[in-house]
Each structure stands twice: as structure tokens, then as C-alpha cells.
Amino acid sequence: FSDQTAVDGARIPTLEEVLHLIRRSGNENVRLNIETKLRPTEPELFLEPREFVSSLLKIIHQQGFSVRVTIQSFDWRTLQETQRQAPNIPTSYLTVQQDWYDNLLMGKPGPSPWTAGHDIDNYAGNVPEMVKKAGGQIWSAFHPEMTAEKVKQAHDLGLKVKVWTVNDTDRMEALIDMGVDGIITDYPDRLRGVLEKRGMPLPKQTPVSP
């Protein structure tokens, strides 16, 4: 991120502070895609999923954002727990199958520790089917792994498709052509430019300062 500007004294805001900022903007159409960060392979470093999700949902409910959030995670345990505690909140199932990170572990004995007991090999490698069976509404895949055929598979199952993390405008164009429902990017201004060029609907901008 060579073009970002450092700000002395800047710190990571709490979720509660972010929600307050959004409310101050006055734009009630702003939604949040909140990702939980747990590692089932290192349980000693994290809260137990039920406690983690309970704490997260408490803030969301207290601030009145229950209908304005989606919860996503590579650790499907937290998504299953969200579905138990707050079935009205959409869950987005993150997946990646790369040498540097693989949360599905296709072809390995037993289920991946990341997928809450679901084994991709029991679905013949069909990721959308496993996400649907797990109760997800959204499949969020690493964008190089997405194809038009996979988008159709997911849509036929009633799932929405989001991809991450797309920073190249040509790739954004290609994924839109495939029919994805959402794109996660580090550069929303680039994506906004692509959407504007294509004549697609754009959300209203509502700048607000902390």
C-alpha cells in the first residue's frame, strides 16, 4: 500500500466506534461485512467460538445493526455459532485452496479443522454444495479460484457469491461478467470507477469524520 498516508497517533477503532461513525453519517443503507478472526489450529490463543460470537452479537444488537451486517469467516465454527445465536444474520463462508493457505484440505483424511465438521471430500469437491449444507447464504471464495461455472453452481443452489481480494480493475470487470454478487477489495474507489463506467447503480457517498 505504497500510496497510503500515515497519520500520527492513528489507531485501530473498535467495532463499537465504527458503528457509531456509521450512525453519525446518517446513511442507513451502509452495511458491514464483519470477518471473525479465529484459528481452530491454535485454540489456546483465542476465545471459544460460542463466547466470541456472543460478544460480537451483543455489540451488533446493542447498536441496532442486526439487519445491516453479514458475518464472514474462514473458521466456519463461528459461522455455525452465528446461525445458532442469530439466524436472521447472513453468514458468508470464506474459502481458499492454495499452497500458502487451504481451509478445505481436499483429499486429506477427515474434515478440515476450519470447516466445522464438514468434509469437502463428502461433497465430491463441490464447495457450493458444502456451503449450502452448512447453512450459509453466501460463498466467498479467493478470486483466482472463481469461474463462471462455479458462480452458476452456487446461484443454482440459491447462494450469493462474493470474491476476495480483488484490486485489479481488469479482474473486477471479468468477475462482474461472471455474475458474482459482490467483490471485496482494498481499493473501493477502483471498484466504484469500474461500476460507474459500466453504468451500474452506485451507493450514495456520505463522507464523515471520526
Q: For the regions a protein language model found, what residue spans apply to each?
A:
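C-terminal active-site rim and adjoining tail of enzyme catalytic domains
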Residues: 93-94, 101-210
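Metal-dependent phosphodiesterase/phospholipase catalytic core, i.e.
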Residues: 1-90, 94-98, 111-123, 133-142, ...
